[in-house]
């Protein structure tokens, strides 16, 4: 399913929906870790934020017991590529399944490094993840997250 990440400055990224299919508006932040995506998702410091993972392939070792807390905290999740077939003897499921279970909307297939560059140059801003092609840009700027 087609999805969009719309930043409050009007920048639009088109990709594919992952996780929950609900709309999300939140502050967009980034993480440059090469591993530890599950720890990022379960880290309470990301509460109220949508996390951009800059490493290009996420989910390759699936969901393991290595959680920082018992639930996921981010409002949204943004990746370049999501592994469909994790490979790990400790794997208990896929990242896609985890995002769905935790009701976290996300988007894949966008240039996360270009997005990170925008955030570094322009500073903190809100963004929306949606599957609705008739999104309201003004709604993003009005959001108090």
Predicted features along the sequence, with ranges:
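RNA-binding accessory domains that recognize and position tRNA/RNA substrates
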Residues: 1-144
């Amino acid at each position: 399913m087609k999805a969009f990440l719309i930043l409050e400055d009007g920048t639009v990224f088109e990709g594919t929906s992952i996780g929950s299919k609900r709309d999300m508006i939140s502050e967009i932040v980034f993480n440059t870790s090469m591993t530890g995506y599950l720890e990022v998702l379960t880290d309470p410091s990301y509460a109220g934020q949508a996390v951009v993972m800059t490493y290009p392939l996420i989910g390759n070792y699936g969901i393991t017991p290595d959680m920082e807390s018992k639930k996921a905290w981010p409002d949204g999740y943004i990746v370049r590529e999501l592994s469909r077939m994790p490979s790990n003897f400790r794997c208990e499921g896929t990242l896609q399944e985890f995002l769905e279970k935790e009701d976290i909307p996300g988007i894949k297939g966008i240039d996360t490094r270009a997005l990170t560059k925008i955030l570094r140059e322009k500073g903190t801003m809100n963004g929306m993840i949606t599957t609705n092609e008739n999104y309201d840009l003004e709604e993003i700027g009005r959001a108090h997250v």
